[in-house]
């Protein structure tokens, strides 16, 4: 195989709780992860030169060893002693630095793509172990679907599929440092923790409204005071028909779960006209 086309899908957190902090600075979490339909397009092609060439539609995105796709390719080349190089055409649609694991999903696709291009037949479980070396979300981005993530996010338990629902995604024009958010969380007196087990139970019942009502993200207690526009977008979504709305990951992206496509599109138009979020996308839950 000389070339492969891949779709790197975004994720949202239906629930995100932080259990504690490790001595190495990492945090133990419990998260309910869900893949959505929004995706980046990736084309990977083998080339004879010993190079990794990345082309992207985002001008400020690094295309060197600071890019997670580059890191994933280099990891596979070194691990399995692969000759030749790779050219990558990365067409991004997932908002950057948005709490939606866009970079991690791109890296997951790069691992998967290298496995296919070089016909390595590396088991998925082994790819997921390699993924942790790139980032905590990469193993989940290989698994996709509905899952409980524990540890630093790498311990995954497959959950029943989240029922189909309409999801509106809105990213305000601010970039959030995940590292900063977690550092500030250590000094924040968090009084309200999301009911992760309750969210899982609602998913098992296939009750979208119940899932939405139980959604919660402990990181909102840090990010929203820093960027109040996040709370404004949440309120706008709920006032315009969302069953509930929440920040994904460390932010700043907000997603809302809607009962129907019509109300979702109406809210999208409102948010675009208001102008607090430049990137507003309609999507849906994705089941692999």
Curated annotation (Swiss-Prot):
Keywords associated with the record: ATP-binding, Isoprene biosynthesis, Kinase, Nucleotide-binding, Transferase
UniProt-annotated binding residues for ATP: 95-105
InterPro entries noted in UniProt: GHMP_kinase_C_dom (IPR013750), GHMP_kinase_C_sf (IPR036554), GHMP_kinase_N_dom (IPR006204), IspE (IPR004424), Ribosomal_Su5_D2-typ_SF (IPR020568), Ribsml_uS5_D2-typ_fold_subgr (IPR014721)
Positions of the catalytic residues: 11, 137
One Gene Ontology term of the molecular function aspect: 4-(cytidine 5'-diphospho)-2-C-methyl-D-erythritol kinase activity
Catalytic activity: 4-CDP-2-C-methyl-D-erythritol + ATP = 4-CDP-2-C-methyl-D-erythritol 2-phosphate + ADP + H(+)
EC number: 2.7.1.148
Biological process terms in GO annotation: isopentenyl diphosphate biosynthetic process, methylerythritol 4-phosphate pathway; terpenoid biosynthetic process
Pfam families cross-referenced by the UniProt entry: GHMP_kinases_C, GHMP_kinases_N
Pathway annotation: Isoprenoid biosynthesis; isopentenyl diphosphate biosynthesis via DXP pathway; isopentenyl diphosphate from 1-deoxy-D-xylulose 5-phosphate: step 3/6
PANTHER family in the record: 4-DIPHOSPHOCYTIDYL-2-C-METHYL-D-ERYTHRITOL KINASE, CHLOROPLASTIC (PTHR43527:SF2)
Similarity comment text for this entry: Belongs to the GHMP kinase family. IspE subfamily.
Stated role: Catalyzes the phosphorylation of the position 2 hydroxy group of 4-diphosphocytidyl-2C-methyl-D-erythritol.
Name used for this protein in its record: 4-diphosphocytidyl-2-C-methyl-D-erythritol kinase
Species assigned in the record: Lachnospira eligens (strain ATCC 27750 / DSM 3376 / VPI C15-48 / C15-B4) (Eubacterium eligens)
Classification lineage: Bacteria, Bacillati, Bacillota, Clostridia, Lachnospirales
Gene label: ispE
């Amino acid at each position: 195989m000389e070339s492969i086309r891949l779709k790197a899908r975004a994720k949202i957190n239906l629930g995100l709780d932080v259990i504690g902090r490790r001595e190495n600075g990492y945090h133990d979490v419990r998260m309910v992860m869900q893949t959505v339909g929004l995706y980046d397009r990736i084309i990977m092609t083998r080339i004879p030169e010993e190079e990794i060439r990345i082309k992207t539609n985002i001008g400020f995105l690094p295309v060197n060893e600071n890019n997670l796709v580059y890191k994933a390719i280099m990891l596979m080349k070194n691990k399995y002693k692969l000759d030749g190089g790779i050219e990558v055409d990365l067409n991004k649609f997932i908002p950057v630095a948005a709490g939606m694991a866009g970079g991690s999903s791109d890296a997951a696709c790069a691992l998967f793509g290298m496995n296919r291009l070089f016909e390595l037949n590396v088991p998925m479980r082994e790819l997921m172990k390699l993924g942790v070396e790139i980032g905590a979300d990469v193993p989940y981005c290989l698994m996709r679907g509905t899952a409980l993530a524990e540890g630093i996010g790498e311990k995954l338990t497959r959950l029943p599929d989240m029922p189909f629902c309409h999801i509106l995604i809105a990213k305000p024009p601010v970039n959030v440092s995940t590292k900063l958010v977690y550092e500030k969380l250590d000094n924040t007196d968090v009084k309200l923790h999301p009911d992760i087990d309750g969210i899982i139970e609602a998913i098992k019942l296939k009750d979208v409204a119940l899932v939405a009502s139980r959604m919660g993200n402990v990181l909102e207690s840090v990010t929203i005071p820093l960027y109040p526009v996040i709370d404004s977008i949440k309120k706008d979504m709920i006032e315009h028909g969302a069953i509930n709305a929440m920040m994904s990951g460390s932010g700043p992206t907000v997603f809302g779960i809607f009962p129907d496509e019509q109300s979702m599109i109406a809210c999208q138009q409102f948010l675009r006209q208001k102008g607090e979020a430049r990137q507003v996308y309609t999507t849906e839950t994705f089941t692999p």
